């Protein structure tokens, strides 16, 4: 419905038929929403990222999904933290590729050569702004399991993480 008066203005009225959701429907929706937010509850991730801001953002987003996150600032620190950790401490490593001291490719290669098979086989997901097919291939050749592009898109990262748990 439209009402209009020259020099005064117009009024538009729209009627949208709908029904009120039952209490059961709204409760079910709340439970689904709540379980989605904690979809990675209890997962401990070793985040290897040299950029403080990127690390802070990734940590916050992962914590919102229910993860516990430890951070390594470069590949050397990542390898060292994994070697010193008890088996099963980390379920997955998120690895930046371009870092000082030791890059992500070299760190992944060192991890895959560890004597402890449980640590050597930990899932490693490359996180990098380089999203070309050759970058993905380089990550796989270094022993990483998968590749996600930055900036982080949780609609991509969460299912990728789930795939390896």
Model-inferred region functions:
Residues 1-165:
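C-terminal compact regulatory domains
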């Amino acid at each position: 419905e439209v009402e209009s008066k020259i020099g005064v203005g117009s009024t538009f009225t729209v009627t949208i038929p709908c029904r009120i959701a039952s209490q059961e429907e709204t409760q079910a929706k709340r439970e689904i929403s709540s379980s989605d937010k904690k979809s990675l509850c209890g997962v401990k991730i070793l985040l290897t990222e040299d950029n403080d801001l990127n690390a802070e953002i990734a940590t916050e987003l992962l914590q919102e999904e229910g993860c516990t996150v430890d951070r390594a600032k470069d590949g050397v620190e990542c390898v060292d933290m994994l070697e010193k950790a008890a088996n099963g401490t980390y379920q997955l490593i998120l690895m930046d590729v371009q870092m000082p001291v030791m890059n992500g490719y070299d760190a992944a290669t060192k991890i895959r050569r560890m004597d402890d098979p449980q640590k050597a086989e930990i899932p490693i997901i490359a996180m990098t702004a380089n999203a070309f097919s050759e970058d993905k291939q380089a990550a796989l050749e270094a022993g990483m399991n998968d590749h996600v592009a930055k900036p982080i898109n949780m609609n991509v990262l969460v299912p990728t993480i789930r795939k390896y748990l």
